[in-house]
C-alpha cells in the first residue's frame, strides 16, 4: 500500500485554509498572550542575581528615544540578539529573544537613526536597556490590543 494518499490526506488536514477560521480578535488575544509570556519570562531572568546597585530605569534620553521608536523595534531586537551572545549564562534569554520577532510589528518607514548600542559583555547595561525595551513593547502591545478590540 502506498503512503502517498495518507500523506496527501494529512497535508489537507493541516493546511491553514481547511482549518476553522480564526477571527482577528482571537488571533490578537492569542498572540498577545504568547508575546506577553515571553516578555515576562525574559524580565524574570533579568531580575535574577547578581543584581547591581544601578537603577535599571536610569537611561539617558537618547537611549530611551531609540528604544521607544517604532521603526527601530526590529533593529533594536537584532542588537539585543547580537549582544546576548557576549554574555555568560544568558542562554535562556537568548532563546526567548530569538522567538520574540513575530511579536513586533513591521516598520512603517525606514529608521532615521541607528539601533541601540550595547557594550559587549556588559550585563548591567544589557539588562537595563533590555528591561526598558521590553516594557516599551509591552505597553505598545497593550495599547494596540485595546484599540483593536474596541473596533470589533
Curated annotation (Swiss-Prot):
Sample GO molecular function, one term: cytokine activity
InterPro entries, alphabetized: 4_helix_cytokine-like_core, IL-3
Function of the protein: Granulocyte/macrophage colony-stimulating factors are cytokines that act in hematopoiesis by controlling the production, differentiation, and function of 2 related white cell populations of the blood, the granulocytes and the monocytes-macrophages. This CSF induces granulocytes, macrophages, mast cells, stem cells, erythroid cells, eosinophils and megakaryocytes.
Biological processes, Gene Ontology terms: immune response; interleukin-3-mediated signaling pathway; positive regulation of cell population proliferation
Encoding gene (name): IL3
Assigned protein family: Belongs to the IL-3 family.
Stated name of the protein: Interleukin-3
Keyword Magnesium tagged: no
One Gene Ontology term, aspect cellular component: extracellular space
Tissue: Activated T-cells, mast cells, natural killer cells.
Keyword annotations from UniProtKB, A to Z: Cytokine, Disulfide bond, Glycoprotein, Growth factor, Secreted, Signal
This protein's record includes keyword Protein transport: no
